[in-house]
Amino acid sequence: GIRERGLMPKIEGLLSGYLGDASIGKIVLDLATEIKAANPDAIWLCDPVMGDTDTGVFVRPDIPQFMKEHFLNGLADMTKPNQFELELLSGRKMRSRQETVDTARELFTDKGCRVTFVTSLLTPDVPEDTVETLAITKDDAWVVRTPLVERKPTPNGQGDTFSSVALGTYLKTKSAKDALEAAVNTLYGLVSHMDSGALDLPLIDEQRQILSPEPVSYTHLRAHE
């Protein structure tokens, strides 16, 4: 329908996430290629959803290899792996924040990706009871540290919410730092204000956390050369 209406050149952003099958990934790749041909300024944020530390790999067995073969070529402008997914794609364990930055650059930004967000970072140099999120570009990197808020069961939609806010902010400001801060503040605010045992983020009841999120009081930013 979008193609038939001639709207491809007007698309400014594309967000992709969980893939039920590698064949769907091929459709996403073809669509991203078509959109960028129609509008070279369009931004594609690819969230390579494959698993997490507490669940292991939860996608079909062919997805990780598909990601390695097709999504590490620089076509995506932005990526958002969590620590587990970055380790899965790189084949090595992250032992420090700086190693995480270097690995993200090797896999993504050195191949043309503008920004890589690494979420759920719990390397040994991250202080206890906190979690870090990184935004990494070719020349700089920023880190935001927040208290580790664990919810059981894990709320649905956290990755989608982060990616949506990050992409939307980047489209407005073209700033990786702004996108990182907005996404982390929004997600932390939503998770902090949700009822214990709830399955979904309170996107309606806590809309203010999306429109005007509360800054995390001890957020700090740091650039890496």
Locate predicted features.
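Short arginine-rich
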Residues: 112-113, 186-198
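A short helix->loop->beta-strand "cap" motif at the edges of active sites that frequently abuts
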Residues: 35-43, 112-114
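Glycine-rich nucleotide/cofactor/substrate-binding loop typically near the N-terminus or early
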Residues: 1-27, 31-32
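Conserved small/polar residues in nucleotide/adenosyl-binding loops
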Residues: 219-225
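Conserved phosphate/ATP/ADP-binding segment of small-molecule kinases
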Residues: 58-143, 151
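Glycine/small-residue-rich loop that forms an oxyanion/phosphate-binding "nest" at active or ligand-binding sites
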Residues: 32, 43, 48, 53-54, ...
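Short, small-residue alpha-helix embedded
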Residues: 88, 152-176
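Short, well-structured alpha-helical segments that form the helix of a local strand-helix-strand
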Residues: 103-105, 176-190
